[in-house]
A protein has these predicted regions:
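Preference for short coil/turn "hinge" residues that link or interrupt alpha-helices
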Residues: 18, 33, 54, 86-87, ...
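Hydrophobic aliphatic residues
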Residues: 85-88, 149
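Non-DNA-binding regulatory cores of transcription-related proteins
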Residues: 94-177
Length: 177
């Protein structure tokens, strides 16, 4: 009997028989995953089934690149559906506006930082792995900078190992929004 299928994503493994760790998500992140799941099930899945049917109608499947591409896409879509369903089942949805962490940096908090060397100021919100988007100021809970910030409060200095060496950031403000 072949081994059960395994899907990984966001640092977690999903397979039959495994007990999954809780996956922290902000409310926005959970909604984004639900929206993606809905789109995959109601739009993408049907589109790829149609593409497979059209490719089959072309005849010989042994040398049919469109058929192979559609089957590959179908495999990706089905795998992503399983992955998202697993993440949502294991999700712990956290509403940052309801946090009261006493001014400490925790998952979901928004942190204003000042790089000590340059004086540059940045603002990040610490979110789940699937939500991270540096361009929008959303950093993953598992990123080096988030790990350095967790548990600290305004006035503390966090040292982050960056590719160019260690960078020090002073925490200017911590908000739960």
């Amino acid at each position: 009997m072949p081994p059960p299928p395994v899907f990984s994503g966001g640092g977690f493994i999903f397979a039959p028989g495994f007990i999954m760790a809780t996956i922290p998500l902000t409310r926005r992140g959970a909604e984004q995953l639900k929206d993606e799941l809905q789109r995959l099930k109601s739009v993408d899945r049907h589109a790829v089934i149609q593409a497979i049917a059209e490719a089959r109608a072309q005849g010989d499947l042994s040398e049919n690149a469109e058929y192979e591409a559609a089957k590959d896409k179908q495999g990706f879509i089905e795998g992503r559906i399983i992955e998202i369903e697993g993440k949502l089942a294991a999700a712990q949805v956290i509403d940052p506006t309801r946090l009261d962490a006493g001014g400490r940096v925790v998952f979901g908090s928004t942190v204003d930082l000042e790089e000590e060397a340059s004086g540059a100021q940045v603002t990040y919100q610490i979110v789940g792995d699937d939500e991270a988007d540096l361009k929008q100021g959303l950093i993953s809970i598992s990123s080096p900078i988030a790990r350095a910030l967790i548990g600290k409060e305004a006035g503390d200095v966090a040292e982050v190992q960056a590719p160019g060496g260690v960078k020090s950031y002073e925490i200017v403000d911590v908000r739960y929004q």
